């Protein structure tokens, strides 16, 4: 590694994972303009990953046990991940304000019930509405929910859209999520027409 090397469009993620020597992780940006899946090879409990970016992205780290963790990747940023394979909920991701916000949120909600985490997610989004961290939390707790709740999700979506009108990641997410939201629990059935067999 060359210490003075720096690319303004590259995000560097340095990681250490206790209680594991060799494993492969997968990283991808769901719903972004750059949907490729990369493999991160952890060797000796450590790894380095670089990703070229044109704009901030919310990345998903997929572990071998299929648990997921979100992080915000920004062009030119240097991010550090410190984890323990035996307790991934205590993972620390630091180096940028966005990822430190996500780490604080994860730690604060780790032992809460699903409903309590969802309520905490709503408050986090309102408190940090101009951040990519808020978009990440919205995606995790509302977009990826099996049964999104319209009365909870729609006001958050409206608030995020107003606060971040130029966020391409948010716009792409809206295109995919809005049809699901229109059919969510609590919504009216959309108007439609049907032609019978007899015309």
Protein language model regions, located:
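Alpha-helical repeat scaffolds
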Residues: 117-121, 150-160, 188-194
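N-terminal "domain-start" segment that seeds a small globular fold
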Residues: 171-199
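Short solvent-exposed coil/turn linkers within tandem alpha-helical repeat scaffolds
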Residues: 127-131, 163-171
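Short coil/turn linking the two alpha-helices of tandem helical-hairpin repeats
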Residues: 142-147
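Amphipathic alpha-helical repeat scaffolds of TPR domains
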Residues: 130-141
């Amino acid at each position: 590694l060359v210490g003075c090397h720096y690319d303004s469009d590259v995000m560097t993620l340095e990681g250490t994972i206790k209680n594991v020597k060799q494993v492969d992780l997968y990283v991808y940006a769901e719903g972004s303009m750059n949907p490729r899946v990369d493999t991160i090879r952890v060797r000796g409990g450590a790894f380095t990953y670089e990703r070229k970016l044109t704009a901030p992205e919310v990345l998903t780290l997929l572990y071998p046990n299929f648990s997921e963790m979100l992080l915000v990747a920004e062009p030119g940023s240097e991010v550090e991940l410190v984890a323990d394979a035996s307790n991934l909920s205590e993972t620390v991701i630091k180096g940028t304000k966005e990822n430190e916000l996500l780490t604080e949120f994860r730690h604060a909600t780790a032992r809460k019930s699903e409903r309590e985490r969802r309520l905490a997610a709503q408050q986090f989004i309102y408190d940090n509405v101009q951040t990519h961290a808020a978009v990440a939390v919205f995606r995790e707790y509302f977009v990826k929910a099996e049964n999104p709740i319209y009365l909870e999700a729609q006001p958050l979506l409206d608030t995020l859209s107003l606060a971040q009108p130029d966020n391409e990641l948010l716009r792409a997410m809206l295109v995919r999520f809005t049809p699901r939201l229109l059919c969510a629990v609590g919504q009216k059935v959309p108007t439609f027409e049907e032609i019978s067999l007899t015309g």
